[in-house]
């Protein structure tokens, strides 16, 4: 568990470097908003992790399968759900990540999907739409809880969302 907290801090710092680069390229980029979104997403990581303690979750299988004896990394390469095992294999077997650390890593992938979604929509819809007399619609949409829940865990949601938003 301690490794997961350390990884959260490391990924937060890496995010700051990414934000510096993005802020140079995009005048509209808001580091403050992205930092708030980071911690909001981490809250959903905690919620999803709590959910997995008391309920069945695919994330447990995605953590267990890459540790099978007699399987190597490229045995998991493919276009099915085994691709998630392929992505997680080096972190579990070479870097020694535990379940909680894998949850954090994939939650960060999901978070990066939100960063790229923000860039995509802010670039392509430059008009700020205000709702409820006070709130920017894009900001409000970024904080909808459903996508945060499903992209804050070891699973398909985070890498799919990241990939979609990176190449949108």
Question: What role is predicted for each listed range?
Answer:
Residues 10, 92, 96, 103-117, ...:
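Transmembrane alpha-helices of multi-pass, membrane-embedded glycan-processing enzymes
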Residues 22-27, 51, 55-56, 95, ...:
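Membrane-interfacial segments
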Residues 51-65, 74-87, 96-97:
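Extracytoplasmic catalytic/substrate-binding loops of multi-pass membrane glycan-assembly enzymes
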Residues 143, 149-151:
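Membrane-embedded catalytic interface detector for glycan/lipid assembly enzymes
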Residues 28-32, 117-143:
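Transmembrane-helix signature of polytopic, membrane-embedded enzymes
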Residues 1-43:
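Start-transfer (signal-anchor) and selected internal transmembrane alpha helices
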Residues 153-156:
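Short acidic/glycine- and proline-prone juxtamembrane loop motifs at membrane-interface regions
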Residues 17-22, 104-126:
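Transmembrane-helix motifs of polytopic, lipid-linked glycan transferases
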């Amino acid at each position: 568990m301690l490794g997961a907290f350390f990884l959260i801090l490391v990924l937060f710092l890496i995010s700051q470097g990414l934000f510096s680069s993005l802020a140079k390229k995009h005048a509209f980029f808001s580091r403050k908003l992205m930092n708030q979104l980071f911690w909001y997403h981490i809250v959903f990581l905690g919620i999803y992790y709590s959910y997995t303690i008391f309920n069945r979750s695919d994330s447990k299988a995605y953590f267990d399968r890459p540790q099978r004896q007699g399987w190597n990394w490229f045995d998991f390469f493919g276009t099915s759900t085994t691709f998630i095992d392929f992505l997680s294999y080096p972190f579990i077997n070479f870097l020694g990540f535990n379940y909680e650390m894998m949850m954090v890593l994939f939650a960060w992938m999901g978070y990066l999907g939100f960063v790229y979604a923000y860039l995509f929509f802010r670039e392509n819809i430059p008009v700020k739409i205000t709702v409820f007399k006070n709130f920017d619609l894009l900001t409000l949409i970024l904080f909808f809880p459903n996508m945060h829940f499903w992209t804050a865990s070891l699973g398909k949601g985070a890498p799919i969302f990241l990939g979609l938003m990176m190449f949108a």
